[in-house]
Amino acid sequence: MDSNTVSSFQVDCFLWHVRKRFADQELGDAPFLDRLRRDQKSLRGRGSTLGLDMETATRAGKQIVERILEEESDEALKMTIASVPASRYLTDMTLEEMSRDWFMLMPKQKVAGSLCIRMDQAIMDKNIILKANFSVIFDRLETLILLRAFTEEGAIVGEISPLPSLPGHTDEDVKNAIGVLIGGLEWNDNTVRLSETLQRFAWRSSNEDGRPPLPSKQKRKMARTIESEV
């Protein structure tokens, strides 16, 4: 196993522990708590994949961080902060909407890269809006935290979430995953549109109703599927 992979996991575990202590003192805001919960799932998945214990890794990560801080000067810290581009965290959903449990009558699940797409195929003839919480850098989606599909009544009927064991995705990965979710929901005559923030940052262009144009490859794939079932 690569030593950098192990040490990276150890440092991530310790930094998560520090953030958890901060949250335990009721000092974290909603975006902070969102990321904390998601990162915990990611760390558990990575620990399982690597065969490493999180508690042991946290102690090792503490030693690594302490060693770095001992060598770090205030001037070097200022230069590091100045050189890192700042990202923004955007929220379509409340904490309640993000953490709410939901159930599917006819579940369908698909994995696309490091993203998991889930939808309820029993939903028909509904107006659906896609909402997401994500970070943005250079006016583009950087990291998806969670995307969910809501009916006008507020019911959750679909979801796109990062897989804890496979961290890392691009804005193009998210775009393709949304296309899959939209295609699945529209198959049952649902009308799907995107929130304004998704329209702006996940796509640079969309139809007037907020519905993004499907990538040409996806259109061809859907057309072949329809033809094969007729």
Curated annotation (Swiss-Prot):
Residue span of motif Nuclear export signal: 137-146
Segments for region (PABPN1-binding): 223-230
Modification comment: Upon interferon induction, ISGylated via host HERC5; this results in the impairment of NS1 interaction with RNA targets due to its inability to form homodimers and to interact with host EIF2AK2/PKR.
Cellular component aspect of the GO annotation: host cell cytoplasm; host cell nucleus
GO molecular function: protein serine/threonine kinase inhibitor activity; RNA binding
Motif (Nuclear localization signal): 34-38
Sorted UniProt keywords: Eukaryotic host gene expression shutoff by virus, Host cytoplasm, Host gene expression shutoff by virus, Host mRNA suppression by virus, Host nucleus, Host-virus interaction, Inhibition of host innate immune response by virus, Inhibition of host interferon signaling pathway by virus, Inhibition of host PKR by virus, Inhibition of host pre-mRNA processing by virus, Inhibition of host RIG-I by virus, Inhibition of host RLR pathway by virus, Interferon antiviral system evasion, RNA-binding, Ubl conjugation, Viral immunoevasion
BP GO terms, sorted: symbiont-mediated suppression of host cytoplasmic pattern recognition receptor signaling pathway via inhibition of RIG-I activity; symbiont-mediated suppression of host gene expression; symbiont-mediated suppression of host mRNA processing; symbiont-mediated suppression of host PKR/eIFalpha signaling; symbiont-mediated suppression of host type I interferon-mediated signaling pathway
Organism superkingdom: Viruses
Region of interest: Disordered: 205-230
Region of interest called RNA-binding and homodimerization, as start-end residue ranges on this chain: 1-73
Quaternary structure note: Homodimer. Interacts with host TRIM25 (via coiled coil); this interaction specifically inhibits TRIM25 multimerization and TRIM25-mediated RIGI CARD ubiquitination. Interacts with human EIF2AK2/PKR, CPSF4, IVNS1ABP and PABPN1.
Biological function: Inhibits post-transcriptional processing of cellular pre-mRNA, by binding and inhibiting two cellular proteins that are required for the 3'-end processing of cellular pre-mRNAs: the 30 kDa cleavage and polyadenylation specificity factor/CPSF4 and the poly(A)-binding protein 2/PABPN1. In turn, unprocessed 3' end pre-mRNAs accumulate in the host nucleus and are no longer exported to the cytoplasm. Cellular protein synthesis is thereby shut off very early after virus infection.
Protein family per UniProt: Belongs to the influenza A viruses NS1 family.
Protein's name according to its UniProt entry: Non-structural protein 1
Organism: Influenza A virus (strain A/Pintail/Alberta/268/1978 H6N2)
Organism taxonomic ancestry: Viruses, Riboviria, Orthornavirae, Negarnaviricota, Polyploviricotina
Chain's gene name: NS
